């Protein structure tokens, strides 16, 4: 077999990768996990379980819901509908087709159901199966996720944001002393299920314990304990220990000595050993717990106490008369002086009492005696009355209600997570399958609550990430599915009961519309299903990794306090402490940290390296916030020697509660994987983040998401090394699916012959159609450019094409520009930015924005609307851009007001003139009465038409334009098919040739003779089809040729079939909305050059607006004549404390000067002044070890590498592990510059040096999506508000402004009465005055009369609404 690697002539694509000088010291052991896997895993793996065989599906997601809802039985148990399996059909349209046709990308869900019908014998009640029907039922279209983790809903790309909510389980709190005036802590507990009723337990100020269900009226806790079946005795025995007082004649009582119950106090009586009679301590002496332990250790077991000590104690069992066995006092009663006399009189020798001491209070005993309910029935009825007030309480209803509340699987679900949390908090060992409350749970919740009150244990921290979990896409949609299926279940039962069950099939019972509407509603209207932020690739990734505390079942903005929004120690490595919105959502919407992932229970995990005996291993362990609390964790920058041993006497470690301790190396359990794991993706792209103030870093990471993709992309010279990962995972770039060799490349597509051979040995072909000038959700431009050349060898997952805002496989949100920090004539006051004309001239910050305009031709009452060029009363000039159908040409330059698509709408019949009557009589036809309803370019838009799409309803004849577009698309598909076939044919026939050459012919076409030996020349004379006609002697070769032929035919047939399906889809017409005959979409691309008023920003939160564009000759310049591009205000730094931008500027200055040095060396090498060794030496000095792979290559490749860095050397300074100030100075020295990073600068206007040295360097700046073109507008004539008759406000309403309050003061100050009157009446909201003034201007007169402004009438109406009848009476003077 031929090895395809024989013809790899060209270099591998990996040779083109950008190499950065990396300042990081910490070796990365773990790669950054795929940045969008949180979405894909949750939906595809956990919810849909796509591509998994039915038998291997786990009971989770869709499978678990279907299992829990089915089987469904009717009321009489005759019919039973069971679930067998489910599967998905292939979607009708692919992602691209759905985007273009405004459809949802979804796959039909087919569920196999089995309907069993039973026969029930009325006499005996025995059941026999009467019949079984199994059928596949269509359950609606379920949205599928695209490969980038998004959904296409009605043609737009949407993202479902993950939600942070409180984990199910039990939580204990106190009120922090806020409720009671004394500041006493009132403890409470709350059981939060995944779904079901909430149970609250609470102490009141009198230390009585109550409970509430769903925040209704409170009841005594003992009512709940009785309701779960506990008697008084069981309650007391469960919560209290008992101690026995034994009578000692004439001395008192002997009781067991328990040192744990002793607190420090002065004795009121002697401490006497009951066994020996020795006095250990005299009355008035002090006893302490330590002393008590000492006595206990020395053998003190029982002590003697006085007779009256029993008074005030509580009985731990019924007190009975020893002779008659009569109950004298009930369990739990307090011993009084009278009762003690009875005990003495009856000579009762042993009395059992409850152990109640300073460490444990009598709360439950007191509650028991306050509660009037004495048995289970009374307790259940009491609960029933609270939950169902007004309904008569009987025991059956009460029992059923109570059972349904907490113990019914269908109505109450703690979820597996809730059960795990419950078990760990209450120290129980109940199976994880039990997801309802148990009696043990309730008993132990009360126990823990009482212990907390007694000072044992600590309350829970709600903001701890062990108590908050993430609900991702899969789980959110799972909950919607459950709602839909429960609704459907009701309709199935109704249909079962209504119809004749014997004749019914499963599909007759199931109404899929119920399910579909619930899912649709979620995707279209849920607060968590959001329009994807598609400004640039970073904003897409960030949106998919966002965690929101808002949404259904979450918090609301108004009620969220400071604690929820604050950074918590457990956020470390899980949630980014920097990236969150400014404003009212601060802290409620967060971003996942770079290395974080979500475990199967929904808790966020962070990776750590294991440390064994003080030695750091490469084993990476992911820990959740709960697990992390058990260990001591060191920082990533702890010093480690070559053998991996931690150095230093003590290591700084994090322990539970976010505290830091110093421990010895062998005590350390884990260390961080990398310092970058603390921050999110956006923050990890900011170099020198460690030198910036947190507030500015927050702005920096937020503004990177608003950067507009530029025409010319440029990766930052000073990066952090994460740029490549972001570009790859964002889906903006195109990745190779398999190893292969590039066969064809143009700007629209890449064809790669793969090297992964199939069973038959023939290659498959990957064709990548690139996106050209597509509109994103935010009207920015998506355009992909190939990075490969023909003959390149690519590996799987190599980046083969750049997308928007990417450059050579790295994210490139802005441009590197030469910046000087200096004041310039006040034009950089208040963060304004001064830019050179070169930036505009060379399109440095020019971006393309694409607007979409749509026109629909509908079928109206009066007849169909028509798309046509034939529009009444429109000049030929206005139609110049339209084709014969009335649709604009691609490439036409349009401005506001131009017609894009001509459309006419039928008008209602108007009375006809005699002339028209005559015409109709002569020509015998009705003159078509239509009005112009064409699509015009709206105000403020101009540009070039880049694409037109025409959609026609099925069955409506297509116009010429639609046919032309269709033909173009079919040609494109045919070319893809032909190219793929050509590559396969080339391979197959070259293989055939190798098999045939040298073989002897038995039979063949006319051109060959039998018995000849085949040569290459002989085969050249044959056509491809004749190869198959040759028969040779060797049977093995013939077998192989047969196999090749079969595989070749199969492949050809598959290709033809795929092509035919796609063509059929194109030709079949479209599913358009109700009443629409034709839809035309026109896309206009606009080039936005940089102009004053546009907002720009750096990566450190330094933002500003362009104030002026200055000619190059007036800008400051360097001594070598280089003109500075941008001048920034040095005062923007000190107070903002984002020093990172200065370090970036210095390192950027080193970058371009090192590049100049390399270029000089290359020139000298070409002129033969130096050898390649000197260049190698300099590169090693600059790059260190990173460069070894390049230096091993041939000389030409080293020189070609040097040319690539001729504009600037690329650095990577990872977050918290990057270049220090000394490293920057070293680089400046290596570049031959002053280590201060400052230079002499010359004023372009005067030609003189500035007085002081100026900081100059390369800085990375972004153009933000706040363009002045989209903000400024002017109004001439426009709409008025109905109530006030004043212009509307805002650009979207084409609004204006009226003369305001302060403007009135200005005219009043000048006493300009008539001007003021004019401004407030005819020029504002005096409607009649306006009309009259207009008339007089038309007539050429100059006089006008002012009336009453409408706002005055509004004021009078408002007075009247307050019952004040104000009238305006005009009296003549």
Curated annotation (Swiss-Prot):
GO terms for molecular function: DNA binding; DNA-directed RNA polymerase activity; ribonucleoside binding. Keywords: DNA-directed RNA polymerase, Nucleotidyltransferase, Transcription, Transferase. The keyword Transferase applies. Its EC number is 2.7.7.6. One of its GO terms (cellular component) is DNA-directed RNA polymerase complex. The RNAP catalytic core consists of 2 alpha, 1 beta, 1 beta' and 1 omega subunit. When a sigma factor is associated with the core the holoenzyme is formed, which can initiate transcription. Belongs to the RNA polymerase beta chain family. This is DNA-directed RNA polymerase subunit beta.
């Amino acid at each position: 077999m031929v090895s395809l690697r024989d013809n790899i002539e060209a270099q591998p694509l990996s040779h083109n990768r950008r190499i950065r000088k990396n300042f990081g010291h910490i070796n990365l052991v773990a790669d950054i996990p795929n940045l969008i896997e949180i979405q894909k895993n949750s939906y595809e793996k956990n919810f849909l379980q796509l591509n998994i065989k039915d038998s291997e599906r786990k009971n989770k997601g869709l499978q678990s819901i279907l299992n829990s809802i089915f089987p469904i039985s009717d009321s009489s148990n005759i019919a039973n509908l069971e679930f067998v399996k489910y599967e998905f059909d292939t979607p009708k349209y692919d992602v691209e087709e759905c985007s273009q046709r405004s459809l949802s990308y979804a796959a039909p869900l087919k569920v196999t159901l089995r309907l069993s019908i039973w026969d029930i014998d009325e006499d005996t009640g025995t059941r026999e199966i009467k019949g079984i029907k199994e059928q596949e039922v269509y359950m609606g279209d379920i949205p599928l996720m695209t490969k980038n983790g998004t959904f296409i809903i009605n043609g737009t790309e949407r993202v479902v944001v993950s939600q942070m909510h409180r984990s199910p389980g039990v939580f204990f709190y106190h009120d922090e002393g806020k409720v009671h005036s004394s500041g006493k802590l009132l403890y409470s507990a709350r059981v939060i299920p995944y779904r079901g009723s909430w149970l609250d337990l609470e102490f009141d100020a009198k230390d009585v314990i109550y409970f509430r269900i769903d925040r209704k009226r409170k009841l005594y806790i003992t009512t709940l304990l009785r309701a779960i079946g506990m008697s008084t005795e069981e309650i007391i025995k469960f919560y209290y220990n008992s101690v026995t007082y034994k009578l000692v004649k004439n001395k008192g009582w002997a009781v067991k000595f328990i040192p744990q119950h002793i607190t420090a106090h002065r004795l009121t009586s002697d401490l006497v050993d009951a066994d020996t009679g020795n006095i250990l301590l005299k009355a008035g002496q002090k006893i302490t717990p330590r002393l008590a332990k000492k006595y206990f250790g020395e053998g003190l077991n029982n002590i003697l106490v006085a007779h009256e000590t029993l008074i005030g104690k509580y009985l731990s069992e019924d007190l009975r008369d020893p002779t008659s066995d009569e109950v004298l006092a009930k369990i739990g009663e307090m011993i009084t002086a009278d009762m003690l006399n009875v005990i003495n009189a009856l000579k009762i020798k042993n009395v059992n009492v409850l152990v109640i001491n300073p460490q444990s209070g009598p709360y439950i005993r007191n509650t028991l005696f306050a509660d009037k309910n004495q048995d289970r029935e009374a307790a259940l009825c009491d609960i029933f009355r609270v939950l169902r007030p007004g309904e008569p309480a009987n025991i059956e209803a009460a029992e059923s209600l109570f059972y349904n509340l907490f113990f019914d699987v269908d109505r109450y679900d703690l979820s597996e997570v809730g059960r795990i949390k419950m078990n760990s908090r209450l120290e129980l060992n109940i199976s994880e399958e039990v997801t309802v409350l148990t009696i043990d749970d309730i008993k132990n919740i009360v126990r823990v609550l009482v212990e907390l009150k007694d000072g044992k244990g600590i309350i829970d921290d709600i903001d701890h990430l062990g108590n908050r979990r993430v609900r991702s896409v899969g789980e959110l949609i799972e909950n919607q599915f459950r709602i839909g299926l429960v609704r459907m279940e009701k309709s199935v039962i109704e249909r079962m009961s209504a119809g004749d069950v014997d004749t019914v099939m499963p599909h007759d019972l199931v109404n899929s519309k119920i399910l579909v509407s619930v899912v649709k509603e979620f995707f279209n209207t849920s607060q968590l299903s959001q329009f994807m932020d598609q400004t640039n690739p970073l904003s897409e990734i960030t949106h998919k990794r966002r965690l929101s505390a808002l949404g259904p079942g979450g918090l609301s903005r108004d009620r969220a306090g400071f604690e929820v929004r604050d950074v918590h120690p457990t956020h470390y490595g899980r949630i980014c402490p920097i990236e969150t919105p400014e404003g009212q959502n601060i802290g409620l919407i967060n971003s996942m940290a770079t290395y974080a992932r979500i475990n199967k229970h929904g808790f966020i995990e962070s990776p750590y390296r294991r440390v064994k005996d003080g030695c750091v291993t490469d084993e990476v362990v992911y820990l959740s916030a709960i697990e992390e609390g058990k260990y001591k964790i060191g920082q990533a920058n702890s010093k480690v020697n070559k053998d991996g041993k931690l150095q230093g006497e003590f290591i700084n470690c994090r322990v539970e509660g976010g505290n830091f301790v110093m421990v010895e190396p062998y005590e350390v359990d884990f260390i961080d994987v990398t310092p970058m794991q603390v921050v999110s993706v956006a923050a990890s792209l900011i170099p020198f983040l460690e030198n910036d103030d947190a507030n500015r870093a927050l702005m920096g990471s937020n503004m990177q998401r608003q950067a507009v993709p530029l025409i010319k992309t440029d990766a930052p010279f000073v990066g952090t090394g994460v740029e490549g990962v972001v570009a790859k995972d964002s889906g903006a770039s195109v990745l190779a699916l398999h190893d292969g060799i590039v066969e064809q490349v143009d700007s629209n597509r890449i064809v790669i012959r793969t090297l992964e051979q199939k069973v038959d040995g023939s290659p498959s072909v990957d064709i990548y159609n690139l996106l050209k000038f597509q509109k994103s959700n935010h009207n920015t431009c998506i355009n992909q450019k190939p990075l490969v050349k023909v003959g390149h060898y690519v590996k799987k997952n190599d980046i083969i094409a750049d997308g928007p805002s990417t450059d050579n496989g790295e994210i490139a949100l802005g441009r590197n520009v030469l910046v000087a920090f200096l004041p310039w004539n006040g034009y950089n006051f208040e963060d304004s930015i001064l830019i050179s004309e070169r930036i505009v001239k060379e399109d440095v910050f020019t971006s393309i924005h694409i607007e979409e305009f749509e026109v629909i031709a509908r079928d109206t009452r009066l007849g169909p609307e028509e798309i046509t060029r034939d529009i009444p009363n429109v000049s030929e000039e206005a139609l110049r851009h339209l084709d014969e159908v009335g649709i604009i040409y691609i490439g036409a330059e349009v401005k506001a007001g131009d017609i894009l698509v001509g459309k006419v709408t039928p008008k209602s019949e108007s009375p006809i003139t005699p002339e028209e009557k005559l015409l109709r009589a002569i020509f015998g036809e009705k003159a078509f009465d239509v009005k112009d309803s064409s699509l015009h370019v709206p105000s403020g838009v101009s540009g070039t038409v880049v694409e037109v799409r025409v959609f026609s309803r099925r069955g409506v004849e297509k116009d010429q334009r639609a046919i032309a577009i269709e033909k173009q698309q079919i040609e494109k598909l045919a070319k893809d098919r032909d190219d793929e076939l050509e590559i396969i044919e080339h391979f197959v026939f070259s293989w055939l040739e190798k098999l045939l050459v040298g073989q002897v012919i038995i039979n063949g076409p006319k051109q060959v003779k039998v018995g000849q030996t085949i040569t290459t020349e002989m085969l050249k004379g044959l056509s491809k089809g004749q190869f198959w006609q040759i028969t040779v002697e060797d049977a093995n070769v013939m077998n192989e040729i047969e196999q090749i032929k079969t595989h070749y035919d199969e492949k050809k047939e598959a290709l033809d079939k795929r092509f035919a399906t796609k063509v059929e889809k194109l030709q079949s017409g479209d599913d358009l909305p109700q009443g629409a005959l034709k839809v035309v979409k026109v896309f206009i691309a606009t080039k936005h050059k940089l102009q004053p008023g546009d907002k720009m920003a750096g990566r450190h939160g330094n933002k500003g607006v362009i104030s002026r564009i200055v000619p190059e000759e007036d800008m400051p310049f360097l001594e070598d004549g280089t003109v500075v591009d941008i001048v920034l205000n040095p005062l923007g730094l000190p107070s903002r404390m984002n020093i990172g931008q200065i370090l970036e500027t210095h390192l950027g200055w080193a970058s371009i000067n090192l590049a100049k040095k390399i270029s000089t060396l290359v020139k000298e090498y070409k002129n033969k002044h130096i050898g390649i060794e000197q260049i190698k030496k300099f590169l090693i000095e600059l790059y260190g070890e990173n460069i070894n792979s390049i230096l091993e290559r041939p000389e030409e490749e080293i020189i070609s590498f040097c040319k690539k860095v001729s504009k600037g050397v690329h650095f990577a300074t990872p977050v918290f592990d990057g270049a220090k100030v000394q490293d920057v100075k070293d680089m400046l020295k290596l570049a031959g510059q002053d280590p201060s990073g400052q230079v002499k600068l010359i004023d372009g206007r005067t030609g003189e040096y500035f007085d002081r040295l100026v900081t100059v360097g390369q800085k990375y700046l972004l153009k933000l999506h706040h363009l002045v073109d989209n903000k400024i507008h002017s109004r001439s004539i426009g709409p008025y508000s109905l109530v006030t008759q004043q212009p509307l406000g805002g650009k979207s309403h084409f609004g204006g402004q009226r003369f305001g309050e302060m403007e009135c003061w200005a005219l009043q100050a000048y006493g300009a009465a008539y001007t003021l009157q004019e401004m407030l009446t005819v020029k504002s909201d005096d409607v009649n005055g306006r009309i009259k003034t207009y008339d007089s201007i038309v007539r050429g007169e100059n006089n006008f009369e002012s009336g009453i402004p409408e706002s005055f009438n509004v004021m009078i109406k408002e007075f009247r609404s307050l019952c004040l009848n104000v009238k305006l009476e005009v009296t003549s003077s």
